[in-house]
Amino acid sequence: TAVISDMFKKAFHIKSKKVETSLIEQFYYPKFGPGQLWEQTAADFEKMGGHLLMRHNVEKINVRDGRVLSVVCSTESGDKTIEGDIFISSMPVKDLIADISGEEAPQKIREIAAGLPYRDFITAGLLVDRLNLKNTTNIKTLGNIVPDCWIYVQEPDVKMGRIQIFNNWSPYMVEDPEHTVWIGLEYFCNEGDDMWNMSDEEFVNFASGELVKMGIIDSGSVKASHRERVKKAYPAYFDTYAEMDKVVDYLNSVDNLYCVGRNGQHRYNNMDHSMATAFRAVEHIMGVGGVTREDIWKVNTDKEYHEMQAEQNAATAD
């Protein structure tokens, strides 16, 4: 509905006060992709004296007297116990509650957390010679490819959900953006299902076959590929989610524990709002602006729709 409305408004030059994030035409994007943001963040953190521990998988969270005392992590060299004053968690709520030890969460809270649902995700990156989609717009692009950054797939006879065109996100992510196109194919699935269990070769053949079926690429045009599985990519709002407020109340009762991010709050927020939850958490810890623990959980909850935002004045100028 929003897509159709957007098309009509553009056709009749109607300005909208609000615009969906997925329909915004201008945005900031790191030169080498979102990973560059976190690489720079990590570098700045270490420059400020922070110690970043990689490949540490949290196995146990030790709680006593309403406070987290330490976490036990499995590493390549064995288990390691890490103590701290404040703990900020972005791990899935389901796993967080299950890992709490010593002073366990109440049985009801454990049951709610265990029942929280998720949708898992697979993406396949394909480097292709060209796309058969034509650029029929007045927007100039390298190689004159279609100007879209992402395309939602509506065909009922394919399983693909969305196509990313990385040349248009940032041409610096593609070695030869004038003669090749790097695309990302997105699929929604469940961990352990047939699609999830495909080998990389099987999945790439399947995904590229769907592109050929839709006429987007020609058979044999794939020059390179990469596939990634992402567990718990999409927190879902059914099953025990109706009682999520009880889990939030319990987590807020753990004095030095803060939950942030999409999985940390079991909320289908975009990247911007997910980062904002961390900002609110730090503001509360630092005692800035009167931010409460409840405010950390309220980021983006007062919107009409989770990806709706007020259109900035600069963006409305023709």
Tell where the protein language model's regions lie, with residue ranges.
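Active-site/ligand-binding neighborhood in enzyme catalytic cores
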Residues: 1-64, 69, 83
